[in-house]
């Protein structure tokens, strides 16, 4: 992807307890727009660096961080994270989504204060990272645009199939009180009024994605249309034929779509 601006070096810092990575246009531009980009389950902030470079080249202060229990904040190898989470999805996934959403608030605060980024924020991510970005838009009015790839606003993920065995529907398990708190406060589909201000949200979905089915995004848009029709008009759900979950995770074309969505600001 061609860069409009020269890009500085990759920088890292601990923001409180949160390991952050960022890139900026070089030289730094005052009030450059802030872009937050988040990684999928079991990955790390380093996986976001190639797209951070593209975002910085497009003029954004581009930031990512390790999700809760991931990267520098984790103690498990990738396969163990996946095994634990999909062995008890609601008990383990909901706190990861919730804590990471709250951490995103802190990172946005830091980036605006310390990097002098604009308070008009765009946010996005892949799979779990996209889930978090959508949730963040429901609690942070600075987030004006969201772009998500193979992600969902429905944390219950009905019809979620095993990535390794698409014929198998994954059991959700039960949430404990701790996990339930995050769902009760942050799940986008059950907090539609949090989106009444009308952030522009793009869902890039795969028609063949049985792990994060596109109907979650479609139901979110339909539910918004019933109570906030003007808001639903700012939600764009694109279902790409022949694209499965892992196809979407790896897709350069979908990243380009997200970039175009951000640049419409």
Annotate each PLM feature:
Residues 41, 207-209, 242-244:
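Acidic beta-to-alpha connecting loop that harbors the catalytic carboxylate
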């Amino acid at each position: 992807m061609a860069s409009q601006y020269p890009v500085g070096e990759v920088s890292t810092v601990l923001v409180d307890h949160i390991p952050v990575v960022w890139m900026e246009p070089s030289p730094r531009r005052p009030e450059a727009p802030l872009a937050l980009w988040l990684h999928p389950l079991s990955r790390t902030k380093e996986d976001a660096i190639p797209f951070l470079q593209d975002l910085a080249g497009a003029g954004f202060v581009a930031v990512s961080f390790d999700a809760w229990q991931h990267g520098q904040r984790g103690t498990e190898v990738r396969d163990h994270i996946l095994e634990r989470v999909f062995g008890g999805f609601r008990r383990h996934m909901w706190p990861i989504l919730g804590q990471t959403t709250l951490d995103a608030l802190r990172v946005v605060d830091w980036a605006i204060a310390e990097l002098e980024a604009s308070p008009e924020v765009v946010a996005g991510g892949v799979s779990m990272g996209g889930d978090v970005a959508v949730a963040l838009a429901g609690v942070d009015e600075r987030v004006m645009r969201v772009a998500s790839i193979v992600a969902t606003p429905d944390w219950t993920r009905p019809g979620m199939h095993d990535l390794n065995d698409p014929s198998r529907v994954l059991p959700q398990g039960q949430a404990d009180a701790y996990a339930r708190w995050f769902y009760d406060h942050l799940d986008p589909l059950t907090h539609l009024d949090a989106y009444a201000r009308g952030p522009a949200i793009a869902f890039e979905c795969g028609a063949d994605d049985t792990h994060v089915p596109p109907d979650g995004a479609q139901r979110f848009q339909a539910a918004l249309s019933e109570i906030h029709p003007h808001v639903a008009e700012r939600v764009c759900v694109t279902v790409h034929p022949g694209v499965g979950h892992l196809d979407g995770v790896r897709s350069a074309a979908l990243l380009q779509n997200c970039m175009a969505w951000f640049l419409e600001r």
